[in-house]
Amino acid sequence: NCKGEKIAERKPAISFRVYWDGDLQDEILNGTNLSKWNGTEALTINKFPGAMHCNGTKRTPNLSADLFGDWREEIIFSDTEDPSKLRIYTTTIPTQNRLYTLMHDPVYRLGIAWQNVGYNQPPHLGFYIGDGTEDIPWPQLYMPHGQYSKE
């Protein structure tokens, strides 16, 4: 904790972080297993059968990104039977949290690029979202033929 006191006996294995289940905390993606840390243990949310991770011991997805635009991220793996095919996984868990697509954040967009051209690490935001977040910064967009609003 902030006082330097140990808060748990164990810690989860973490390869990637992913926004998946609809709360404002990220989940843990380790290989093809997605889990949620509850402070004591990692609880499995989803396993992706037929999916193949890459990068040997790091066991990363091909890409994780907010591709479809509701702010939660999709995960892309190769197919175990035919690695020339891709599998795109998206969440079906409902959420009450409404945010704009993460791709509107320039730091996040840069993170998607670095996954593809360099060291395969998960993307991060240029602002904080997590438990207790109430005010998400509104993206600075330029609309050449119109205006936009939060509504």
Where does each model-flagged region fall?
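Beta-propeller-forming repeat regions
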Residues: N1-E151
